[in-house]
Amino acid sequence: MSPITLDLTSDFNPANTTGAGSSSSQPRTLLVAPPSVASHEERISALFSTYPRDTTDLHMLDRLAAGLVTLPTSTYDLILVLTDPDGSRHAEASALLSNRAVWSLLVPALKAGGKLRSEDGTLGRDTTTPEAREAVLAGLVAGADGFTKPDYAEEEAVPLRFGLKRKTNPNPVVAPIQPVAQVVTAAPAGVGFVTLDLNDDLDLDGEDDDDDVIDEDTLLTEADLRRPIQQPPECQPKPGKKRRACKDCTCGLAERLEAEDKARRDKADQALNTLKLKSEDLLELDLTVPGKTGSCGSCALGDAFRCAGCPYLGLPPFKVGEEVSILNNVPQL
């Protein structure tokens, strides 16, 4: 049985990213590969023969998905997903790229204007795949050869100067004003005044013709006049209540109720007038004349003929010529 050797070194080697042979002007490349690529050393050796080791980094997709790797920000010009040129590992890479945590690490590490593509060239062609949707949601733009990170210009604060503190010249030089000859043009006849005839439209002379006014009654036929008036449901009185007209009554109920109230008031006034007594209808009590009685017909005849509420109840009959006055409902003889 052959011995098993474990490689415990980190995949991210800082010496490779900041080596003596690297330069900030040289484009940097990040290779991301599915886990199955790690078992093929010849495959990795062939990749580093194409991409220089001093400007290229290699990471595994499963370690990116697990959050075990930290990538520098805005460093790589190209991120290449290894799937083999024949696409034999495309399904494995697509499954890992469907994880949003992978894109949250790859997109910040990509420079503005940098590209992210797959080795077989199929990544980004179909924008309906799960990995394409995650790339677009992360901020990349799909293209024919993969995805591109937009180059957004950095925000800059620009001060606004409104010219409030402008320096003024204490002795400004004023250019002489050249006199301009005034050109006088004669107005043509009929121009320059307006004559208004207000009598044509406003009819201020008081003569108003009703030629354009249509009488509404002429629009009704005999059948319309004989037709009974349809009472609206809202005008119908509720049980136990008096029928009342609406505020904007148009069915004639308000006029009819007003006429009924007026007739009722006239009848009540007529009945009230019949109960009023005139001066000649009043009977004056004159005790100086023998045989005269009060309005009740028995006040001067004695106690037996006085009313129940008479203040002189219990007193003897009045004498002829006797003056009688009442003060506070008390007889004063």
UniProtKB/Swiss-Prot annotation:
Motif Cx2C motif 1, chain ranges: 296-299
Span of the annotated motif Cx2C motif 2: 307-310
Tagged with keyword Iron: yes
Cellular component terms (Gene Ontology): cytoplasm; mitochondrial intermembrane space
Molecular function per GO: 2 iron, 2 sulfur cluster binding; 4 iron, 4 sulfur cluster binding; electron transfer activity; metal ion binding
Keywords: 2Fe-2S, 4Fe-4S, Cytoplasm, Iron, Iron-sulfur, Metal-binding, Mitochondrion
Region Fe-S binding site A, residue ranges: 235-251
Cofactor(s) the protein needs: [2Fe-2S] cluster; [4Fe-4S] cluster
Localisation per UniProt entry: Cytoplasm; Mitochondrion intermembrane space
Linker as annotated region, ranges: 159-225
Binding site residues for [4Fe-4S] cluster: 296, 299, 307, 310
Record text on subunit structure and interactions: Monomer. Interacts with tah18. Interacts with mia40.
Domain notes for this protein: The C-terminal domain binds 2 Fe-S clusters but is otherwise mostly in an intrinsically disordered conformation.
Record-given protein name: Fe-S cluster assembly protein dre2
